[in-house]
Amino acid sequence: MEDYTKAEILIEALPYICKFHDQKILIKYGGHAMVNEQAKNWIAKDLVLLKYVGINPIVVHGGGPEINRAMEKMGKTPEFIHGLRVTDEETLDIVKMVLIGKINGDIVSKLERYGGKSVGLSGKSGQLIKAKKKIQYLMKDSQKIEVDLGMVGEVEHVDTKLIDILVEKRYIPVISPIGVDHQGNDLNLNADIAAGDIAGAMNAQKLIMVTDVDGIMDDVNDPSTLHRRLTIPQIEDMIEKGLITGGMIPKIEACVNALDKGVQSVHIVNGKTPHAVLLEIFTEDGVGTMVVRE
């Protein structure tokens, strides 16, 4: 590539650098993009670059594939209801071991390898996330019944003071989705939904959900059915038609929740696309699916 072409590419990003300068962007990082080494490098480099051009990324990570593998090694079968992991006490210990003990530190190390400053946190740090036990309902024979998810929580309150301090000091916060209830009990939080809550509390400009799919599609086996832009009413219609199911449901709940709390747009991108985060922020067309209120 000629030097002038490289310069033109950099200049193309200038309006977006100006627009998002000093803004917070919440990155929810999950899926198989977290276990692909090349994809992990792309994401880390993207986040460090964002920080150095004056944009403030905040990371909330999942770890579903690694948690599943750890459970299976210990003779436990992962169980999900509407995309939420059923969590008994032993499963919660495994979740914390994988999220806080392994994945969080791996992300921090990767960011620092590429020149960033990063601090690993969980929702337990500095009373960051207060949570309560989640009540889940299912429809059975036209009846609404309550199902017990175990030690699964939903966010009641996000105290942003610790994150604000870290962002001001030029650190990239990396947050594991474990919350604490008012009795001091740990609760497993769905990372997508927690990311939406934190994005809203932080007044983030964008929520970017880095996963292992290209975005929201009518048919997951047909890339041509990818939606580039969706509104909340359109998404609700897709759920009613059964086009959005399983693990995508919590992601959509997170999208709607974040938009309701003032986030301007939510983007679902494939972390296996090289530099998907930079492409989403700094190019006209972006990648993946953008979700807005209307």
Curated annotation (Swiss-Prot):
GO biological process, one term: L-arginine biosynthetic process
Keywords from the named record: Amino-acid biosynthesis, Arginine biosynthesis, ATP-binding, Cytoplasm, Kinase, Nucleotide-binding, Transferase
Family per similarity comment: Belongs to the acetylglutamate kinase family. ArgB subfamily.
Protein location: Cytoplasm
A Pfam family annotated for this UniProt entry: AA_kinase
The protein's Enzyme Commission number: 2.7.2.8
Top-level enzyme category: transferase
A GO term for molecular function: acetylglutamate kinase activity
Keyword Transferase annotated: yes
The keyword Kinase belongs to this UniProt entry's keyword annotation: yes
SUPFAM superfamilies: Carbamate kinase-like
Site (Transition state stabilizer): K28, K251
Record's function text: Catalyzes the ATP-dependent phosphorylation of N-acetyl-L-glutamate.
Pathway: Amino-acid biosynthesis; L-arginine biosynthesis; N(2)-acetyl-L-ornithine from L-glutamate: step 2/4
Superkingdom, natural source: Archaea
Coiled coil: none
Binding site for substrate: G63, G64, R85, N188
Name listed for the protein in its UniProt record: Acetylglutamate kinase
Protein species of origin: Methanococcus maripaludis (strain DSM 14266 / JCM 13030 / NBRC 101832 / S2 / LL)
Swiss-Prot/TrEMBL catalytic activity: N-acetyl-L-glutamate + ATP = N-acetyl-L-glutamyl 5-phosphate + ADP
GO cellular component: cytoplasm
